[in-house]
Amino acid sequence: MSPQTPPLADRRERLDAYLDDHDLQAVWFARPNSFGWLTGGSNVVDREGSVGVAAAGYDREAGFRVVTDTIEAPRLRAEELPDVFDMEAADWYADSLADAVAARSPTPAAADIDIAGFESVDASSLRQPLTDVDIDRYRTLGSDVAAAIESVGQSVVPTDTEREVATALRAALETRGLTAPVVLVGGSERAPQYRHYTPKNVEIGDYALLSVTAHRGGLYVSTTRTVAFDAPEWLADRHRAAVRVEVSALAATQQAAAAGDDAGDVFAAIQDAYAAVGWADEWQQHHQGGAAGFAGREWIATPDHEATVTAPMAYAWNPTVQGAKSEGTVLVTDDAIEPLTTTDNWPTIDVAAVDTVADDVRLSRPSILHRDP
């Protein structure tokens, strides 16, 4: 039985509408994030692969189904799947996953992997917006990720290398049942130079940025923490500037969702926020994030991006200002902006959105943890 059964009535309603709109009999998902969206479980054995070891499907006549091989079937049935899913197993030596699905699915059908004769499905629109059950799971997930990254931030020392800190982060996440496709650690030498500070064998030194993207049950969380031992004199001002851009992005996201605007409209507000905090061109140095949910980012905003901004939905904006970064996963609804990656064990800073974006939005966001060397 899947430990995190998804809201299957909602999934069925969305998939019925998709089949009707596209004149199909079935749709299949073998990519891990969409498999997790539909089942609440995992089809991953090889973390480097973009396709899992099973495909979850919805059949107009037969309902929820899973196709896998004889190696994986017993484990998936016992540990990863709700009982409502019917399972079929092909001999491991006989067929590829694509061939096994093709042999068992009614047609016409669609899939998120290449299957001869099947249409292609982009599941991102099906995964949005979030349901109440998704949101409840997200709150627990966000708290667990925050606890993991903060436990490491509270224990590192200046002589730790970036790779040692990254190893500690992965361990803290794994013990909480979380898989982390992204773990970044940038010390005082490299964090000001690079936006993606992939860990190296260098000491973190005077301060460090710790950034992770982790997932469980299909849902993804991204967040960053800053820990300082002998902080550069510019760090506090740059961190506050990044936080203010993030809060402005969240305010603009809520406005866009209410108005039916798109990602490009939010990006314009982000550009305005950077200008307001004195870093007008800084947005050109790094992507700013976007919608989270059942992917690290369902979409990443750009100046001309036309993705519709929806609510309720999780968003992870990640503005940077030359060695400082503010990032968290936040639930945006019609009437609330709720940070998900928070605990009571880290210092916070209350910051308002810039006036050109919103004059009445103020949020508490993670601040810099100052520690003795």
List PLM regions with ranges:
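Active-site neighborhoods and metal-handling regions in enzymes and metal-associated proteins
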Residues: 1-373
